[in-house]
Amino acid sequence: MGIDRNLAYLLHAATRQHLPPSRPAVTLGVQARHGGPDPFAAMGLGAVESIDVSDFEGCTHLLDLNVAELPPELRGRYSLVYDGGTLEHVFDTRAALRNIFGLLCTDGVVAHASPVNGWVEHGFYQFSPTFFVDYYQANGWSPLGAFLLHLRGGGRATVHHYVSGMWDALPAGAISGLWLSLMVFRKVPGARWDVIPQQSFYRRIHEDASAPPIAAGLAYAPPFDLVDGVVAAEDRVVRRLPRPSPGVGYEWHAHLPQLEGVADTTEGRLSPLLLFEDGRPLGPPHAAHQAIRATGHGLYSHWGAWLHFSTSDNAPPGERVYTYSLPRAL
């Protein structure tokens, strides 16, 4: 897969506040760079080495990530492990994660760029983002960034900031096309590799249904488009939200009958509406109505002729100003 300009932009955005130590970096497989400046050099890292199961592409070190033990000379050697589409080809995922842990020094960073959807027969697996977030959270790593990229072609990708639970309510088929994830985590002191996580979706159901969906240190932000590593300007119209009425629990309703044609549906259509409270984005959108009512804290859903939403602090809207934006082309 390698690293293109969009992935390089997001990797820089994720690590700029917590740069890895100045040591060698390693890529899993020989990773081509598809244009743009070298993201590893921009982070001030040392030499970039590579690991692969064969020397067909001229890797630095021969290693099968399925193996039980790392060579002593590779343990703790690297400040960054970049997985640019290798993990899905390794049958023993747990062994590979253990070896990634072993390759990294303390405060080192792992970055996984992995297929999420649309890559049938590309590898053994397509990883949902919850796999990485739940695993690294359970093992005490610090999250630096979690992004979902919907690839549009021509160097364009729509980027979604991922937080746990944000798409629990999406119907089957809502995610179509080619999607990648970029998941970036730091191996802080005390981090582990061997804790087996329980999927957070079921933890929310069985342990604490009211737990906030923003977990693991990740925060929601509205989606945006990247074109060859540059944020694309989007022409959107901003309108004042009609006066809302109270619903159940933390839920509020606003009537938007003129927008019913772009609302979320059970067939998988996702509304492009973005909601703001005093100019600050709320979200995540497309939330389950029960989560809006029981959890709140900015969750919302544009469904049918109504916007179902919660305020950022679960207090009544009061004098706060609520606006929404839509692409001007609609």
Give residue ranges: language-model regions:
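Class I SAM-dependent methyltransferase Rossmann-like catalytic core
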Residues: M1-R23
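Extracellular polysaccharide-degrading/modifying enzymes targeting complex plant/algal/animal polysaccharides
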Residues: A221-L330
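S-adenosyl-L-methionine-dependent methyltransferase catalytic module, highlighting the catalytic core
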Residues: L70, F91-Y220
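Short, P/G- and charge-enriched loop/turn segments at secondary-structure junctions
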Residues: G36-P39, M166-G173, G261-V262, A294-H297
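Basic, amphipathic N-terminal segments that precede the first structured/catalytic domain
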Residues: G2, V26-G29, Q290
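A glycine-biased structural micro-motif
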Residues: P21-S22, G76, F309
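Conserved SAM-binding loop
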Residues: A25-E121
